[in-house]
Amino acid sequence: PGLTALPDDHSDELEPSPREECGVFGVWAPGEDVSRLTYFGLYALQHRGQESAGIATSNGSQILVYKDLGLVSQVFDDQALSNLTGHIAVGHVRYATQGATTWENAQPMLGPAAGSTLALAHNGNLTNTRELMDAVHATSGEDLSGELGRGSSTDTAVLAALLNLVSERGALEGWDSAADILTSGITDDADLDAAYSAPAPLSVHHAARRVLPMLRGAFSLVFMDEGTLYAARDPHGVRPLVLGRLGNGWAVASETAAL
């Protein structure tokens, strides 16, 4: 009740009503059933997106992802959750702002990073996606516009490509990272200094510290590699992201209802 299907001709064109919500959830909790914690977190965030749902988990050495079109209760059953083992999890419910409602656009998105694997869940919109895609093309020769046309067509795919490329090479060709830092308002940050002085290949942590100041727009991100959970939001906090403390870990979510 209250849900309507997208029309068959749904595309990236502007629509008559805003479509700007998604729900993200992440948890790092050794000894806990993180896939079920994430399931219930996403269930509490279901109002933020009804097109697809997904969960990625890591046991410290391998990331598994399960996602599909539909509601949280339709996508996951006991068997699916039992197969998602580990102590770190990232989850997502989607309400499209860009890209068609296809399996390829369901999140979390899984991709490579230097020496590791990345699972990424994203809420929001980037306003400089074209510039970022051009910088990726100038650095690696990879034409993201063609790749996105064949499959995923979201900002999330661009973010995943950026994190992978910067982790491997350390920087983007022709990109003024110093200007990004000044614009971001980040100053006197020893961790950021370490990220920019580290030689490539970079950890996901250091790659993220270089990539995040490049982003323009409103966004919140929850992502992980095999051993660490990360979370970030735009400097103005336009897209919500809250932090919660567990007895032996941490959780992040789009809303406190999920905590």
Which residue ranges define each predicted feature?
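Conserved short alpha-helical segments that host acidic/polar catalytic motifs at enzyme active sites
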Residues: 1-259
